[in-house]
Amino acid sequence: MAITKINDCFELLSMVTYADKLKSLIKKEFSISFEEFAVLTYISENKEKEYYLKDIINHLNYKQPQVVKAVKILSQEDYFDKKRNEHDERTVLILVNAQQRKKIESLLSRVNKRITEANNEIEL
């Protein structure tokens, strides 16, 4: 994923404002928080059958309680299963089966489509 460098305060404000509009759109239209969206995107981007919660927290730029809450909600909505490691109770594993991965990919596909539509609606 290519990230464009921001050259000045005007570009920064413009990008942050635009990102905030998209975050709002995702929350409103798909009924998920941006932290939940970030967790699902991480899982989609890293095709594994299991993930360590600690790795997800370290990768995302959110505080641990925010990610833990997002993971709990997503687990309750059957986007994945969450369990404690049998050998180390402190370690939380996120397990994704084929059906759950399909559910994640379907949601992210709908979000991507909506972002494309929003690009045509929002004045950049």
From Swiss-Prot:
GO biological process, one term: response to stress
Stated consequence of mutating residue 11 to A: Able to bind to the agr promoter, but fails to repress spa expression or to activate RNAII transcription
Principal place of residence: cytoplasm
Known outcome of mutating residue 84 to A: Unable to bind to the spa promoter. Fails to repress spa and aur expression
Cellular localisation: Cytoplasm
S-S bonds: none
GO molecular function list: DNA binding; DNA-binding transcription factor activity; metal ion binding
Substitution effect: residue 88 to A: Able to bind to the spa promoter. Fails to repress spa and aur expression
InterPro entries: MarR/SlyA-like, SarA/Rot_dom, Transc_reg_Sar_Rot_HTH, WH-like_DNA-bd_sf, WH_DNA-bd_sf
Subunit structure, interactors included: Homodimer.
PANTHER family assigned to the protein according to its UniProt record, in alphabetical order: ORGANIC HYDROPEROXIDE RESISTANCE TRANSCRIPTIONAL REGULATOR, TRANSCRIPTIONAL REGULATOR, MARR FAMILY
Name under which the protein is recorded: Transcriptional regulator SarA
Gene designation per UniProt: sarA
